[in-house]
Amino acid sequence: MPRKGPAPKRPLINDPVYGSPLVTQLVNKILLDGKKSTAERIVYEALEQAREKTGTDPVVTLKRALDNVKPALEVRSRRVGGATYQVPVEVRPGRSTTLALRWLVTFSRQRREKTMVERLANELLDASNGLGAAVKRREDTHKMAEANKAFAHYRW
């Protein structure tokens, strides 16, 4: 294991079209096989579709979707005397954003629409309205934490 501690966080460059670091993070989550220009095209077209359907700024829609998907609690496995407990812990802000983006992209890929642009746009719109699979994942995560509240004293 390295002894110098964790690598320093690299600053996120604001995205050139919307000037938002969240859009940059979304592009990086969509990215497959190093094809960044393809990922950017998918994200920008999806945000444009979201703008056409809602008539509002797509970055606002993205932020609203993220706020509806970000988990406040999650469970972590903790081994105590031969038994493994699911211990509920609070999620740090950076991790909650990362999880929300990951869930949005994962569930966009599982949707049935024809193109990835449509899938991502519709998942974003659903999430911003409090619907969709990504929001359900957040609710399930919170339910797990609530169900295991008895083990909260094992937090570290």
Swiss-Prot record:
Gene of this entry: rpsG
MF GO annotations: rRNA binding; structural constituent of ribosome; tRNA binding
Similarity comment: family membership: Belongs to the universal ribosomal protein uS7 family.
SUPFAM superfamilies for this protein: Ribosomal protein S7
Gene Ontology cellular-component annotations: small ribosomal subunit
Species, as recorded: Rhodococcus jostii (strain RHA1)
Function (record text): One of the primary rRNA binding proteins, it binds directly to 16S rRNA where it nucleates assembly of the head domain of the 30S subunit. Is located at the subunit interface close to the decoding center, probably blocks exit of the E-site tRNA.
One example of a Gene Ontology biological process annotation: translation
Listed name of the protein: Small ribosomal subunit protein uS7
Keyword S-adenosyl-L-methionine: no
Keywords: Ribonucleoprotein, Ribosomal protein, RNA-binding, rRNA-binding, tRNA-binding
UniProt cross-references to PANTHER family, sorted A to Z: RIBOSOMAL PROTEIN S7 (PTHR11205)
Quaternary structure and interacting proteins, as annotated: Part of the 30S ribosomal subunit. Contacts proteins S9 and S11.
Domain of life assignment: Bacteria
InterPro entries for this protein: Ribosomal_uS7, Ribosomal_uS7_bac/org-type, Ribosomal_uS7_CS, Ribosomal_uS7_dom, Ribosomal_uS7_dom_sf
